[in-house]
Amino acid sequence: MDDDIAALVVDNGSGMCKAGFAGDDAPRAVFPSIVGRPRHQGVMVGMGQKDSYVGDEAQSKRGILTLKYPIEHGIVTNWDDMEKIWHHTFYNELRVAPEERPVLLTEAPLNPKANREKMTQIMFETFNTPAMYVAIQAVLSLYASGRTTGIVMDSGDGVTHTVPIYEGYALPHAILRLDLAGRDLTDYLMKILTERGYSFTTTAEREIVRDIKEKLCYVALDFEQEMATAASSSSLEKSYELPDGQVITIGNERFRCPEALFQPSFLGMESCGIHETTFNSIMKCDVDIRKDLYANTVLSGGTTMYPGIADRMQKEITALAPSTMKIKIIAPPERKYSVWIGGSILASLSTFQQMWISKQEYDESGPSIVHRKCF
């Protein structure tokens, strides 16, 4: 597709928004899904202070702002802020006119129907797009890995789900969703760092902890053994310099934090860990296709970026599955963006072009058309 008419692909995650042009191999714009509003009254006249900041600008001024994420657990909870993020995406990041190009949006599986109707409505009525489509995130990740059958364990900032897909169709009865993801791990790390005597409380400090998490955390292959190692030596300790120059040391927190993915009881949650959820999802599928799912377990999303997570998944699922089963965990290096990459592939396929919901169809049937045309 030509860049001047290439479709726009926007993957609105709970934590990061990824946007760019169909046919590209990576998103052009990646920025935090944050809207910040000033905490204090502006006193300097002529400073050109705004009443809200989006994305990186909100992040850089976080010391004076209250930061809000309009998407929680993959579901848009604040549409006014969401509109600001889309506006920022089109006009500031990509610098394109949305009324000239089709837009592909993504959504979490098992999202409320009203959510996708509202997305459709805003695209056509506020941004006047000529055509749009809403795709399920996990399905796009599978496309990006070059498969049509497999089970995707997609874990981002707000929600984790396991989606079995057979010959390109998601199997809705077997999709499982776990409201435990990156943001919960950041909160948990804030909590266990407090036990070490470091206090992080504000929305701005939470972003610092998120950075610590991304740079230093990893998944232990054997949690108990790792805890013993951490207790007996300082070999696992790492230091991190805070923005004010203070240096903090972090030890067993490095692997205790992501361990919550496998043991949600750490967060006081009764749900199963990601390994069991994946296994349960496979068990809800027809017995004939399970073998293909075990052999094509694809990890996607930012929360699967921890070193050691693929080996641990392999170990845990092997323990749950029948002993003769061949299990393969696929963790592509670009999995942080695989949803976007899958969207870019999909929107540039010639066979996909008749799948778009056009402005004309929308005008005839209203927002509910999205349920008929997008699955």
Swiss-Prot record:
UniProt key word Cell wall biogenesis/degradation: no
Gene: ACTB
Modification Methionine (R)-sulfoxide occurs at: M44, M47
Annotated EC: 3.6.4.-
Entry-linked Pfam families: Actin (PF00022)
Subunit structure, as described in the record: Polymerization of globular actin (G-actin) leads to a structural filament (F-actin) in the form of a two-stranded helix. Each actin can bind to 4 others. Identified in a IGF2BP1-dependent mRNP granule complex containing untranslated mRNAs. Component of the BAF complex, which includes at least actin (ACTB), ARID1A, ARID1B/BAF250, SMARCA2, SMARCA4/BRG1, ACTL6A/BAF53, ACTL6B/BAF53B, SMARCE1/BAF57 SMARCC1/BAF155, SMARCC2/BAF170, SMARCB1/SNF5/INI1, and one or more of SMARCD1/BAF60A, SMARCD2/BAF60B, or SMARCD3/BAF60C. In muscle cells, the BAF complex also contains DPF3.
SUPFAM superfamilies listed in its UniProt record: Actin-like ATPase domain
PROSITE patterns, alphabetized: ACTINS_1 (PS00406), ACTINS_2 (PS00432), ACTINS_ACT_LIKE (PS01132)
Protein name from the UniProt record: Actin, cytoplasmic 1
Reactions performed catalytically: ATP + H2O = ADP + phosphate + H(+)
A molecular-function term among this protein's GO annotations: hydrolase activity
Primary role: Actin is a highly conserved protein that polymerizes to produce filaments that form cross-linked networks in the cytoplasm of cells. Actin exists in both monomeric (G-actin) and polymeric (F-actin) forms, both forms playing key functions, such as cell motility and contraction. In addition to their role in the cytoplasmic cytoskeleton, G- and F-actin also localize in the nucleus, and regulate gene transcription and motility and repair of damaged DNA.
Residues that bear N6-methyllysine: K84
InterPro entries noted in UniProt: Actin, Actin/actin-like_CS, Actin_CS, ATPase_NBD
Similarity comment text for this entry: Belongs to the actin family.
Entry keyword annotation includes Nucleus: yes
Primary site of residence: cytoplasm
